[in-house]
Amino acid sequence: MEISRLVVVTSSDTIFLLLNSTFNVAVVGGGLVGLASARELVLRHPSLTFAVLEKEKELACHQSGHNSGVIHSGIYYTPGSLKAKLCVQGAALCYEYCDQKGIPYKQCGKLIVAVEQEEIPRLKALYERGLQNNVRDLRLISAKEMQAKEPFCRGLMALDSPYTGIVNYRHVALSYAEDFQKAGGRVLTDFEVTNMEMAKESPPESTEGLKHPVVVRNSKGEEVYCQHIVTCAGLYSDRVSQISGCSPEPRIVPFRGDYLVLKPEKCYMVKGNIYPVPDPRFPFLGVHFTPRMDGSVWLGPNAVLAFKREGYKLFDFSPKDFGDAVLYSGLWKLVSRNLSSGMNEMYRACFLSAQVKQLQKFIPEVTINDILRGPSGVRAQALDSEGNLVDDFVFDGGTGDIGSRILHVRNAPSPAATSSLAIAKMIAKEVEERFGL
């Protein structure tokens, strides 16, 4: 995919900021959801001015660039829920968008495999759920049919989802940004938002008074003035909300997922995505086999508490991030309910042999000599004060002048990458209704 045409402006370009510091809407966060939302808004309202403010020097650096790359079909989610609707819509929009833009993807399918008899009723219930969600081409298949698709996979029965695919979501995110810029939007990187408040006076270059009454400052003291703000801050959504005087709830607790990778000479053993039957007692899906666009195969991930919000390595540590997490009562309530599974995840994170044992339930031929440690990602898990994982989308604003001009996307849970274009349409509608665009 051609991505060299994307032009971003760093906040250190003071000439740009002096000449172009006022916008109708500023979107905080240059990940998939922020970029898709900004793109949707500028396409709907080409006469208005929009900016994306991203704290990193590049776009899609964190969750958007550290995910599994799966285009989910919408099987897992409660029928009628927002997640289910947005995933099914989003998958179709994602494929259509990739076709239009020439972004490579592979519709390699997914098998959800029951390896024990007790998992079969749950697998059948998952099939019924998928049908209710209108997932395309879903079917239950026998062990023989499963092995025709995945010759090295073992199991009693599988749920076959041929509509599931894979893509490089960073390419998708950069394409959103390119669309946004071509439509007149501005992308400001290296702009870490540290303050939002009502402006006491108009910007120096303005001849329109306080038409843009909200001032957004970054860590360097540079300013952008706008009428409205949409925040899609991912791992920092709670802190960005607090900056504007809005509620810190729900809190973000970071969970790191470590992947293993199959050695290149062993990748022939996996053709499509292979997933376990989810256990309703545990909050995450469990280890799985994920082919990648570059031909590699990722295994995992686990799910362990990260000691830093952008902590991609085992010993990455931030006193503030760690303190915020361990002092939050909601985390301790979550831990107390999932102590055994949490300890198992920590054990598997430290010992490859424990992860391999889980993988061998599906592909017995995989050995510890076939794998290497791979990349990691950090998931922004929203958690309420009772220790419940917030499983759906959360939007809020605040009170007073500034709160009425801000829409915070507090939680955009997995599969937000798959659903990003559908989420963007929902956010754009919310912005139009709240702010009267």
Residue map of PLM features:
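Short beta-strand to alpha-helix junction loop
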Residues: P79-Q89, V113-R122, D160-Q181, L188, ...
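Helical element adjacent to the flavin cofactor pocket in flavoenzyme catalytic cores
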Residues: L159-H228, C232-A233, R239, L421, ...
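C-terminal catalytic lobe of FAD-dependent flavoproteins
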Residues: S329, L334-L437
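Glycine-rich FAD pyrophosphate-binding loop
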Residues: V42-G65
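Glycine-rich active-site loop/strand segments that organize a redox cofactor
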Residues: A60-G90, Q100-Y105, A306-M343
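Beta1/beta-strand and adjacent pyrophosphate-binding region of the FAD-binding site
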Residues: L19-V33, A51
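Flavin-dependent oxidoreductases
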Residues: A36, M196-S318
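Dinucleotide-binding Rossmann-like beta1-alpha1 core, especially the glycine-rich loop
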Residues: G69-K149, G155, G286-V287, S296, ...
